[in-house]
């Protein structure tokens, strides 16, 4: 049984054992574009990836399955070298602890996503970044674009263009890096990990 056949079995729930770790060559390969109309297995894989993110953000399911929380997942992290990413960004509660009107700021499975424009200004998360494929802490500012325009296709083959900024832009860039064989720590300044470039936004 191939990797993808195992992952898309109806009863299978993706867990941390399915996620490959740094050092695996798939994480350093430039992934292949998917073709349209999508094969059923590509649609099912996208659905399974989104299901994993939902489970990882659910305290009960995360504990049951032993999941680390995640907001994004790329197919290469599952040892599938295809240009598929899933992003699930919850909206925060308000200052009174009330649930947001919209549960998610971004919820999408993107096929063949591509950054088509970006800001001159850079940005980085104040607390740095982590990755489900990296089991160690790598401190430092991960320098990315503050704003990006991304083209992608959905599972029906329809093309979309989204303009993203802030945390949404950071997360999508992290996942697009995965399909290009780039790890987040490649973007940390080796000699001065917390160097701040002129005009760079630090996102709390």
Swiss-Prot record:
<feature type="binding site">
    <location>
        <position position="131"/>
    </location>
    <ligand>
        <name>Fe cation</name>
    </ligand>
</feature>
<protein>
    <recommendedName>
        <fullName>Peptide deformylase</fullName>
        <ecNumber>3.5.1.88</ecNumber>
    </recommendedName>
</protein>
<keyword id="KW-0408">Iron</keyword>
<dbReference type="InterPro" id="IPR023635">
    <property type="entry name" value="Peptide_deformylase"/>
</dbReference>
<comment type="function">
    <text>Removes the formyl group from the N-terminal Met of newly synthesized proteins. Requires at least a dipeptide for an efficient rate of reaction. N-terminal L-methionine is a prerequisite for activity but the enzyme has broad specificity at other positions.</text>
</comment>
<dbReference type="InterPro" id="IPR036821">
    <property type="entry name" value="Peptide_deformylase_sf"/>
</dbReference>
<keyword id="KW-0648">Protein biosynthesis</keyword>
<dbReference type="Pfam" id="PF01327">
    <property type="entry name" value="Pep_deformylase"/>
</dbReference>
<dbReference type="GO" id="GO:0006412">
    <property type="term" value="P:translation"/>
</dbReference>
<keyword id="KW-0378">Hydrolase</keyword>
<dbReference type="GO" id="GO:0043686">
    <property type="term" value="P:co-translational protein modification"/>
</dbReference>
<feature type="binding site">
    <location>
        <position position="174"/>
    </location>
    <ligand>
        <name>Fe cation</name>
    </ligand>
</feature>
<dbReference type="GO" id="GO:0042586">
    <property type="term" value="F:peptide deformylase activity"/>
</dbReference>
<feature type="active site">
    <location>
        <position position="175"/>
    </location>
</feature>
<feature type="binding site">
    <location>
        <position position="178"/>
    </location>
    <ligand>
        <name>Fe cation</name>
    </ligand>
</feature>
<keyword id="KW-0479">Metal-binding</keyword>
<dbReference type="GO" id="GO:0046872">
    <property type="term" value="F:metal ion binding"/>
</dbReference>
<comment type="similarity">
    <text>Belongs to the polypeptide deformylase family.</text>
</comment>
């Amino acid at each position: 049984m191939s990797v993808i056949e195992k992952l898309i079995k109806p009863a299978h729930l993706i867990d941390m054992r399915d996620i490959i770790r740094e050092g695996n060559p798939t994480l350093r390969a430039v992934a292949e574009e998917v073709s349209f109309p999508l094969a059923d297995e590509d649609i099912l894989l996208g659905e399974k990836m989104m299901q994993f993110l939902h489970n990882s953000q659910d305290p009960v399911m995360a504990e049951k399955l032993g999941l680390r929380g995640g907001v994004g997942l790329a197919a290469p992290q599952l040892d599938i070298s295809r240009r598929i990413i899933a992003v699930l960004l919850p909206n925060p509660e308000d200052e009174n602890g009330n649930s947001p009107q919209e549960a998610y700021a971004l919820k999408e499975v993107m096929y063949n996503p591509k950054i088509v424009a970006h800001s001159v200004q850079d940005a980085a998360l104040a607390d740095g970044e982590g990755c489900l494929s990296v089991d160690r802490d790598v401190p430092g500012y991960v320098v990315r674009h503050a704003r990006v325009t991304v083209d992608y296709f959905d599972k029906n083959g329809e093309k979309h263009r989204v303009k993203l900024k802030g945390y949404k832009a950071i997360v999508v860039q992290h996942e697009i890096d995965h399909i290009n064989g780039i790890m987040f720590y490649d973007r940390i300044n080796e000699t001065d990990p917390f160097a701040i470039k002129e005009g760079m936004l630090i996102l709390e």
